[in-house]
Design a protein with these regions (language model features):
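Proteostasis/folding factors centered on peptidyl-prolyl cis-trans isomerases
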Residues: 139-187, 214, 232-275, 318-334
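Surface-exposed patches in mature extracellular/periplasmic domains of secreted proteins
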Residues: 111-118, 207-212, 247-250
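Short, low-structural-confidence N-terminal segments
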Residues: 1-87, 91, 300-334
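Peptidyl-prolyl cis-trans isomerase
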Residues: 197-234, 263, 267-272
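FKBP-type peptidyl-prolyl cis-trans isomerase
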Residues: 36-69, 101-107, 154-165, 182-190, ...
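Charged, solvent-exposed helices and adjacent loops that form client-binding or oligomerization surfaces
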Residues: 63-92, 108-177, 191-195, 203-204
Length: 334
């Protein structure tokens, strides 16, 4: 793979992981019952929502091939000492699918549905992805076009119920709340040295950035941050500085800091921080409603079937576009 293709693949993988992560997670308080009345190919059921083995294999195989296109097939040999990376990926897929099923149940409760145009998009996406599969992939995944379309519908409905819940979150964020400050920072681990460096910093004609590069124990000198992003002592010292002012020695978590304010307000950074704060509010609002709903549900897991699930290692099973096709038909048409 050439460097350009590798970078493109890495960027796509990052987008896929971000999209999946947005819907990932499974509440720890969900009631679990093992293999109670499940059909042969059902991996799990949450209330009336069922997940069958082909759905798991579509997610698992696409994520597997995305990773392998960037990092190679040997990546699955890595381990954190407890679980192999393959086992971790299996668990992530189970979590992702459980989340989507719960969100679809929540959509039913809130009477949120896909409109005709959204269903048409799901059908078109299902048709495109299914026709991209070769015969070996269809056999290995054991999928039909109807199942793929259903999976796209459920993913789209999960995103739609999320948007329905967060649409009333207050989008107004003040400049002060979102303000980002930029400082040059010196960090040392010795109090006496910090006092010595502070004396140098306040000498007339001394270039603070050059001093920081020479004295700081951190490689990065210039940093930008908003409120709540650094320890309280550093935040208070930084936000009390005017442009070009130098702080006294600030102690935090066993280290000693000296700050020089480069900018008290960065318009671009503040705008980006406002968007970040709104997204955080939205996430918190959704999580509150989702968690309360999820705790009322019973989840049944076909443990024997789940334990038999493994990645497919076949040269003729390389499908990796399931999530890319979804993005093309939904996220690119908003």
């Amino acid at each position: 793979m050439c460097i350009r293709d590798s970078c493109k693949a890495a960027a796509l993988l990052g987008a896929v992981v971000m999209m999946i992560s947005a819907l990932a997670g499974c509440g720890k308080n969900t009631k679990v019952v093992l293999t109670a009345g499940l059909k042969k190919n059902e991996v799990f059921r949450i209330s009336s929502a069922s997940c069958v083995l082909p759905e798991v294999m579509v997610y698992l195989t696409n994520m597997q091939n995305q990773y392998e296109s960037v990092y190679g097939s040997q990546i699955w040999n890595a381990s954190d000492g407890q679980l192999s990376l393959e086992q971790e990926e299996r668990e992530q897929v189970l979590t992702q699918l459980a989340r989507i099923k719960v969100m679809n149940l929540l959509a039913q409760k809130k009477e949120v549905t896909l409109d005709d145009k959204e269903k048409e998009r799901a059908a078109a996406a299902g048709r495109e992805y299914f026709t991209s599969l070769n015969s070996a992939e269809v056999t290995a995944l054991n999928v039909t076009q109807d199942l793929i379309t259903k999976m796209y519908e459920e993913y789209a409905l999960a995103e739609k119920v999320y948007q329905t819940i967060v649409e009333n979150v207050n989008p107004e964020v003040s400049d002060d709340e979102a303000r980002t400050i930029t400082v040059d920072m010196i960090r040392v681990s010795d109090s006496a040295k910090a006092s010595q460096v502070l004396g140098k910093a306040k000498e007339e004609g001394v270039d603070f950035e050059t001093l920081a590069q020479a004295e700081s124990e951190d490689q990065t000198v210039t940093q930008s941050f908003g409120k709540g992003e650094v320890p309280e002592a550093l935040e208070k010292a930084a936000f009390n500085l005017g442009k070009d002012e130098i702080s006294d020695v600030v102690e935090s978590d066993g280290s000693y800091y000296i700050l020089k304010c480069i900018s008290t307000f960065d318009e671009a950074q503040t705008k980006a921080n406002k968007e970040k704060i709104v997204k955080q509010r939205q996430s918190e609002a959704f999580d509150t409603e989702y968690t309360a709903f999820e705790q009322t549900l019973v989840r049944q897991l076909n443990e024997e079937l789940w334990n038999s699930v493994t990645m497919i290692h076949q040269d003729d099973v390389k499908t990796s576009s399931f999530f890319e096709v979804y993005q093309m038909y939904f996220q690119h048409q908003e």
